[in-house]
Amino acid sequence: MTSDDGNAGQEREKDAELIEVGGKKVSKTSTGKRKFHNKSKTGCDNCKRRRVKCDEGKPFCKKCTNMKLDCVYSPIQPRRRKDSSSSKFASAVHDRVGKKNLSDNAIMLQQQQQQLHHQQEQQFRQQQQVQLQQQLLPHVGTDEQSNSPNSVPPSVSNNMENLLLPHLLASLVNNTSNSTNSSANGAEAHNNITQTAPSSMINNNHPNMALPGNSPLSIPITPSFQSTAMNLSSSLNGLLSPGRLNSVTNGLQQPQLQQQNQQIPQQQGTQSPFSNIPFDQLAQLNKMGLNFNMKSFNTLFPYGAANGMASEFQELFGLGKFATSNNRAIKVSTAEEALANMQQEQEDKNKQFTKNPLDNTKTDAVNSGNNPLNGNENKVTASDILSHNKNLIIDNTGLTISPPHTLSKPSIDQNIASPSTGVSNVTSTKSLLSIPDNRTALGNSPTLKTSPMGDLLSNSEALSPRSSNSHTQQQSSPHSNASSASRLVPELVGLSRKSNLNLIDLKLFHHYCTDVWHTITEAGISGPEVWSTYIPDLAFHFPFLMHTILAFSATHLSRTEAGLDNYVSSHRLEALRLLREAVLEISDDNTDALVASALILILDSLANASSSSPTAWIFHVKGAVTILTAVWPLSETSKFYNLISVDLSDLGEAVINQSNHNNDNDNSNNGDGNNNNTISELVCFDESIADLYPVEIDSPYLITLAYLDKLHREKNQLDFMLRVFSFPALLDRTFLALLMTGDLGAMRIMRSYYTLLRGYTTEIKDKVWFLDSVSQVLPQDVDEYSGGGGMHMMLDFLGGGLPSMTTTNFSAFM
């Protein structure tokens, strides 16, 4: 080794900072891998990637040829010199600051543009509203033709709500005191309204109407203003939104607003006292026989029906022309929701039957000492109840198990439902089903074993088979002796298996056609031709009606025969399930079926009032009434048109009968006192509420007292039962609001109604069988009602937990 080589080695050792480890010299910074390789900077790409020496043969190097690789020579790129880290950091900071400044400038510019656009838009809107007000002023006169909604131009009517609402509210607030300080501008009216929000309602004329809560009320809220505020809730929400305050309080509008505020009290001086009544109450009074002119009031409230007006019975009281397009959808949704709650409650009740079937059996209604039944005969499982609903349609060739909704108006002989033909016509109808006669497979079917007859079938094997003649004799005299009466249901179960017939349901349908329908007509609900022929025939077209009939018939038969409680529950549950589907598809074809089902459900709820909690029947009655609400209005071709559309809407007829003479002289007699403001035809019928008479025309109790007066006058009419139990569903929203907020006057009126209801049920319970049960759960005094007395009882009656009547939804129209 030469000296030069030795010097070079020493230099390399110094450069690499070699240290000696284990007798070997290694680099201090070595990682254990080769730091350098023999690859050529000008070699092919494959050799560079593999870090091997390339012979640089072109176009193919030797290594790529041996390995059968594509030899590629990429052009040599000059290496970039790295900039110092300090300069890079400085440039990055500079770029960041520049971008931030640019973004800030852009944001400021955008905000300025938005503000400018908003100001321009606001000025344009103000100018447009000033023009609209100038066009509107001639239409606020007293001329009837110019005041009619049809005479207002479309451009004006679209903004009428925004322009008139603040002044209407201001005039209504100051009307009772005849204050001369009503010339405040739009901003002052708005401040007064917002400062006196009804967290507590105070009535000067009715001190008992104060609500709990502390609120700096600077303006007394009269009954008329209270109900008006409810009916115009949606308009207030839109008016008091932040985006619309500027357009109300702008200085350009103040001269016009002051001019209108001065004109409106002057016009009120010449108006009839009827103009203070909310729109919904006014229309109801007009239906009852109050023949005053409504054109001036329609001008003030052109959108009354669309903004919060009580919509449940608009068509019932003659407000169909004001109904909105979504009125039916709202009522259908409410009915479907109520039926869903009823269905859920019925399912929970059926689960209780499953857990403890013997304790829930209604054996006390059947002379349990004379008609004992074995425990096994009464025991029915949950699967029995569910699958029983599928066994309804019967043919003389066999039995099928199919969902009830498959029945969609089959061609049926018109003589099926005739009371004289009884069950024989039903079993001889071959157009209902097409079933293969496979009795062996049917007998072994697991579905049949889980029917309501399933558990009883094993116990019925010991029953001796009987001929059809002996069975007919057994049905003709079910009460011949205690032993035969107690064995009727198990015997029918056994015969159903032997003959492949569901004789229980046949027996229930026959029982309705021969016995039950008489009890409905005797209660004054429609005529015999409806319930004896029309409804049974209609039940074959609509399964929900069939299940409703069978449930009601089972309830009636269970008073004399034991073992039918589970049939009542299962048929009612299936009827509710199918009604939920049917109420979403209301048509002229199924209207009568829905009305009949609702009426039967009401009667069935009354008949089973004592079998559950004391308030459960109220929940079911209210839910059934929602079906009647959903099908409104009924067509004149309906069998129930005279019963529902005329009788129920006639509750207040002739109660209020102001003469046309008073209407013609409203302007001249306006200052004569309160003679024109009271209803002389309403006579006190209960001394406990005598202080509420005479009833003023703007009283929040007017409609309710008119209904009760009508009920007392026509107590002996045949249809009184349906009227008295449907009364809570007909309450107007103003009275409902007072009742739900604890108004003492409203509670006293409902106590009077309860006294009427209690006295009526006690009087006729021996004549009408389905009122006997409800008379047992009604306390002697309404204050003894579980939960706190009259208000709680009536709140149950008015909703009982229905979502449509909860306080959450109630706040929507407060």
From Swiss-Prot:
SUPFAM superfamilies: Zn2/Cys6 DNA-binding domain. Pfam families: Fungal_trans_2, Zn_clus. Disruption phenotype: ECM22 and UPC2 (in combination) null mutants are not viable. It is found in: Cytoplasm; Nucleus. Coiled coil: none annotated. Residues 146-159, 367-378, 473-485 have a biased composition (Low complexity). Keywords: Activator, Cytoplasm, DNA-binding, Metal-binding, Nucleus, Phosphoprotein, Transcription, Transcription regulation, Zinc. This is Sterol regulatory element-binding protein ECM22. It comes from Saccharomyces cerevisiae (strain ATCC 204508 / S288c). The gene is ECM22.
